A protein has these predicted regions:
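Secreted/periplasmic proteins
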Residues: 2-113
């Protein structure tokens, strides 16, 4: 028989997997974002592609970003109209958590927390 805890853990893992997005991550120098807040290169922030930004519906929510065996988190503060489906644009501090800034672009998985 399965325990309640095992079932809940399986449901949580499935929910996260279903909600996960895949796309290219690039970096930018933050300033005044579409959500109305000013940030800088050291801020843990992200700009979402137009579809995921959803006219600001996700402003100030946090996302988890995974790639290259690394994980980091960033707060939604801006729109990235040039990002493709699933694409995100992050502050240098966040990009550096996943890959060297010299790389410039890396494919990532990410999801809303």
């Amino acid at each position: 028989m399965y325990s309640k805890g095992m079932i809940l853990a399986a449901v949580a893992a499935f929910t996260t997997a279903v909600a996960a997005k895949t796309g290219d991550m690039t970096w930018f120098h933050p300033g005044l974002g579409a959500c109305g807040r000013t940030d800088n290169d050291g801020s843990p922030v992200v700009a979402l592609n137009s579809a995921d930004y959803a006219n600001g519906a996700h402003c100030f929510q946090w996302i988890t970003i995974q790639a290259n065996g690394r994980t980091t988190a960033a707060q939604v503060v801006d729109l990235c109209p040039g990002c493709g489906s699933g694409g995100i644009d992050v502050a240098p501090a966040i990009f550096d958590d996943i890959a060297s800034l010299d790389v410039g672009r890396v494919q990532v998985n990410w999801f809303f927390q």
